[in-house]
From Swiss-Prot:
Organism: Streptococcus pyogenes serotype M4 (strain MGAS10750)
One GO term of the biological process aspect: proteolysis
Active-site positions on this chain: S349 (charge relay system), D469 (charge relay system), H499 (charge relay system)
Domain of life of the native organism: Bacteria
Its job: Removes N-terminal dipeptides sequentially from polypeptides having unsubstituted N-termini provided that the penultimate residue is proline.
Protein name as annotated: Xaa-Pro dipeptidyl-peptidase
Keyword terms of this UniProt record: Aminopeptidase, Cytoplasm, Hydrolase, Protease, Serine protease
GO MF: aminopeptidase activity; dipeptidyl-peptidase activity; serine-type peptidase activity
Gene name of the record: pepX
Chief location: cytoplasm
Amino acid sequence: MRYNQFSYIPTSLERAAEELKELGFDLDLQKTAKANLESFLRKLFFHYPDSDYPLSHLIAKNDMDALSFFQSEQELSKEVFDLLALQVLGFIPGVDFTEADAFLDKLAFPIHFDETEIIKHIHHLLATRCKSGMTLIDDLVSQGMLTMDNDYHFFNGKSLATFDTSQLIREVVYVEAPLDTDQDGQLDLIKVNIIRPQSQKPLPTLMTPSPYHQGINEVANDKKLYRMEKELVVKKRRQITVEDRDFIPLETQPCKLPIGQNLESFSYINSYSLNDYFLARGFANIYVSGVGTAGSTGFMTSGDYAQIESFKAVIDWLNGRATAYTSHSKTHQVRADWANGLVCTTGKSYLGTMSTGLATTGVDGLAMIIAESAISSWYNYYRENGLVCSPGGYPGEDLDVLTELTYSRNLLAGDYLRHNDRYQELLNQQSQALDRQSGDYNQFWHDRNYLKNAHQIKCDVVYTHGLQDWNVKPRQVYEIFNALPSTINKHLFLHQGEHVYMHNRQSIDFRESMNALLCQKLLGLANDFSLPEMIWQDNTCPQNWQERKVFGTSTIKELDLGQELLLIDNHYGEDEFKAYGKDFRAFKAALFEGKANQALVDILLEEDLPINGEIVLQLKVKSSENKGLLSAQILDYGKKKRLGDLPIALTQSSIDNGQNFSRESLKELPFREDSYRVISKGFMNLQNRNNLSSIETIPNNKWMTVRLPLQPTIYHLEKGDTLRVILYTTDFEHTVRDNSNYALTIDLSQSQLIVPIASN
């Protein structure tokens, strides 16, 4: 374990003493440091009628227990304080450590003893994470140190778990959206699942916009998947034009219906544990699946601003600008009289994507988004540089396949009976509009590109993204983060994992940092919390997070690729082609082992190479035919210890998100030896070699200069490392599987790898 503490708010002595007193710690500025520490420790054992017993189970020195120490005349020293602090946080002498000083250095322990600062040290200790993954104060509250009185209690600028999660209100409302996506002449109704604590105070809201939450149709999804085995189409030379079109909602009328009291209820919905954490701290949770999902009406428009509007309508309702009904019969309306109108959206992948789309509307009431692994351009999710390009792990998927997965209205037999014929008509229109044949950008994709509206974002923004996420690739966050207005507060966490959440990591206090931010933005707490704009997980060692100023630098280093002419054959034998198509993982293994069709260049680094941004391959290339696709991957190659990309559980259910509520495991990325690590990758239809809007011909056996931008990253390579460049055609995980008989030739003498370099 290593501390990377970003959530602690430096506090004055007077304020620290005041907050400790509010928690019931009987500390006195006039007492000695030793007396105050003893008083603090005894308070920790509030379950015991006699605190001597648990105190005797701690050691103050290697040869003296804590009870004996406090009964002695010995003075408090750094060694005693450190040893006791470690034990209070759950570290066991002789098990977790033998030499406290060395262990503290390894931990990067954030508290440095000064006898005159004991009150501040105790305050800091309470806000520091235990071995279990919870801060000490959260651990104490989870054990019942504070009663669940359904009111706010704060410590170090963060809300504590004092809301009763055993008496939650669970209710359903149906919000009227200014849409008619299925064109039935009726405004669409949006189902909203609300979970909120009982409270006399207006509550802020965490909203998870999740098209998955009302169920998914995996059978329809699998039937809709596309075969990837097809020839690469030769496209006609042309220029693509699109236009920015403002989304215009339909008109709605003020509701004059009576207020209803009898709301639909529910017992369970699959929740997001970060939401649960805040539910226990006085934040209502709502789950909204949007148009075309079970319980709602309309068509699943998948990614456009009509879908975004269905979520926006819910924020409007929370602020009194839209109507909600108690049921589909629309006999009574219901108002959000429990809400303070301020909303933060949460969720990963499609959920985080909807957060980004919502933010670009500039809707009033949306104070903040926490968007994890979020899409900012749907074209860049299902296409790349004029190619159909499947997200990592999902060959054959496209946006209409996702529509089939998430159109959960068809899971309700009655809805299927009444609406499936119309749904199939609209789905067919969507399938035609996305133009899988060419892979080109068009108006359909432009209408699903949130980047063009990034300037309208006015809420605070928090993004998290994995630099090993080949599902929602790093370009998605790179482009939106760098397009955000300079006038807003923005934060980016870049971790070394894949398509995963990061709130329950051991090495970073993400959960607590979000607590401090949300208390500022949604509760109006003046806590003076300041979070760095960008935090990056170091790839060279375990559990090390660093501040960064930018994602993408203008300083470049050009690396020569050699002097040879390299031939890349596209064609595989029938058996090999079928085997790779059946299991793309076998293809990846062969590719990285140098066995698949490829041109391979190894570069032994003579100095450190701190990459920050978008690597570009500038290549001199020719094709034997009038078509060609180019794929590239950059590897950190050779055996050494590296971070894994999938977090593993360190402890099971050690994190309590409230008071015995919604427990979850503590996780971390492992650090272990392997043979290589993918740094970046990229794909291009050579007919789109100059830009996305220009379709050009490929002259047979004529040299072309191609600039292939790879996925942006931040990655540190060290002197002596090997940077491996792999150039090839068909990628069996991502691209169409064209087995036609053509070849590409690369002139390495006129080719370079252009690397953006982080400044010192």
